[in-house]
Amino acid sequence: MISKSRRSFIRLAAGTVGATVATSMLPSSIQAALAIPAHRRHGNLKDVEHVVILMQENRSFDHYFGTLKGVRGFGDRMAIPLPDGQRVWHQKGSKGEILPYHFDTSTTSAQRVDGTPHTWPDAQQAWNEGRMDKWLPAKTERSLGYYKEQDIAFQFAMANAFTICDAYHCSFQGGTNPNRLFLWTGTNDPLGQHGGPVTTNDHDSNGPVEQGYTWTTYPERLQAAGITWRVYQDMADNFSDNPLIGFRQYRAAAPDSPLIVNGLSTWKLDALKRDVLANSLPQVSWIVAPAKYSEHPGPSSPIWGAEYTSWVLDALTANPEVWSKTALLVMFDENDGFFDHVAPPAAPSLNKDGTLRGKTTADATLEWHTKGDIRYRNQPYGLGPRVPMYVISPWSKGGWVNSQVFDHTSVIRFLEQRFGVMEPNISPWRRAVCGDLTSAFNFANPNNEPFPELPDTSQADAIVASQIKLPKPKPPAVAAMPKQEMGIRPARALPYELGVHARYRSGGDALSLTFANTGKAGAVFQVFDLLDSENPPKRYTVGARKRLHDSFQGDASGDYHLEVHGPNGFLRVFRGNLRRDLAERKAPLPEVRIDYEPLFGNLRVQLINRGRHPVKLTVKDNVYRQGERRTVNVPPGQRREVRYSLRSSGNWYDFSVSAQGADSFLRRFSGRMEDGRSGFSDPGMGLGTLTF
């Protein structure tokens, strides 16, 4: 477990505005409740008897946690390339280049910063089919603003106290209502059969019975299965964030119908606390915050959102017995327009002739926009950018990070796993790629992880009032790359076992790649061609225990330079020249393949020479072994093996292979070997992008 000083957990946001505000612990009742052991009757998911879901508004992961240690933030060495060859941090607009910059709440009004464009058209523009190079034209310069721990102390403390998910994506490239529909129903009706496809905030308030959506929502499925549920909200002030109001069956329901009583009635946080104290908390609950506390930029602020979250915790922990059986999931519906550097996994884009730019083993029919606005016809709906996700429960304490790919449908899938109520609206592609959140919990041995102190939020109004008078934040005159705090945090085991293997295609006119997935979860490989600035990356969705093959041409001179990006820092780099490497088979023909040996903690590197002449290959460590080099002579037609123990690096690896006599040849392999056990985050996080 990663320790942190007591003082850092009680640092208050007020300190950043020069005000002297007394700090204190959260109420002692909360501390006492959080310290009690988790309910452990079965030692598995059945111990969770209540799931509470709080979806807040409009913050991206980098915007909040790019500087948090031990997560995939600003120190990511595997940041994707832009079409101009620079890394994704270097966004360009009409005023030139801007890097992510600090929303300093001590000198600016950043607590109440204005929002940015966040609709389907501008989200598609910023993403740009995966190029990720249009954030400034689409989202304004505010999109690159981010906070530090001193600005959002409560949010950092939550991440350090419980579990933060750093690969949780919003479901849809766009705004509030479509994303909330994925959380409550698993879909946006992509085929337009029941009032969709939903790409805007239509029907987010009450309307005529004959208007609205008609597909089945997940609360209805819970009701039919006898699972208790409720939406806690103030119907007079829920910021239009309850999407159930847009469904005809809810609009037409009788006043005493469960759809009205539990879905469209006022149940504020005091009602939540009463239900907790009375041991009548439903099995599944959704919470919708008022506008002021929604965390939405403009009408709300991070510290108001923190205050509301602390009230939710206060209510849930008022009865320690109930809290010992409760999981609270807190996420954000979308990123607003705030920048996040990770290219979202998505179904393949389509070429102009309608063919896929990539491949998929999972049915992605429901992932493309085929109805409605022709401007975005055939564009993938998602996934969208990463958003923060906290898993708060007695089974997820200890400052963990979980890096499995999730989206809003993952919340429904968690409920499926716990209560057995299936949601057929979730697409096959999302089921293949997005997990069910169970990997974020420790049910077997949950009670050995202490709970650190949390900041007080009682002075939120005073802090916001003092900051609102300060100047608005703006980019600095001289751009500089932000620094992520160095350090590690405990990391949950993931279900990935991925590989990409290269070989020259027979005939020598292309490089053939095999995308192999021998793990338990699907993954998206994104292939960036650094010599092709015109086309978007190709994407390959490979389901569990499946593989795909494809070939890649070189440029006019035979050069090729490919980067393959996957989940949790998975990276493969392939560089060389097809003509020089293959001309009359006189040049060396090296190939490199790696295999995992998790039982022994080893990585096996196979160095292969398919040419007619000997080749000398040098294997160089890039991060974890102080630049160690091993040079191996490989005779023609043979192979040699090199093994690396990964135990000292927590199974993380990053090395490159070059070939004497083939100057352009380079292979790079980076990632983590999963062995079914929890470990720790990448010790090399924070070093920045490596160049070769």
Curated annotation (Swiss-Prot):
Predicted to be exported by the Tat system. The position of the signal peptide cleavage has not been experimentally proven. PROSITE patterns: TAT. Residues 1-35 form the signal peptide. This is Non-hemolytic phospholipase C. One of its GO terms (biological process) is protein secretion by the type II secretion system. Belongs to the bacterial phospholipase C family. Pfam families: Phosphoesterase (PF04185), PLipase_C_C (PF05506). Keywords: Hydrolase, Signal. One of its GO terms (molecular function) is phosphatidylcholine phospholipase C activity. It comes from Pseudomonas aeruginosa (strain ATCC 15692 / DSM 22644 / CIP 104116 / JCM 14847 / LMG 12228 / 1C / PRS 101 / PAO1). Hydrolyzes phosphatidylserine as well as phosphatidylcholine. InterPro entries: Alkaline_phosphatase_core_sf (IPR017850), PC-PLC (IPR017767), Phosphoesterase (IPR007312), PLipase_C_C (IPR008475), TAT_signal (IPR006311). It catalyses: a 1,2-diacyl-sn-glycero-3-phosphocholine + H2O = phosphocholine + a 1,2-diacyl-sn-glycerol + H(+). Coiled coil: none annotated. Its EC number is 3.1.4.3.
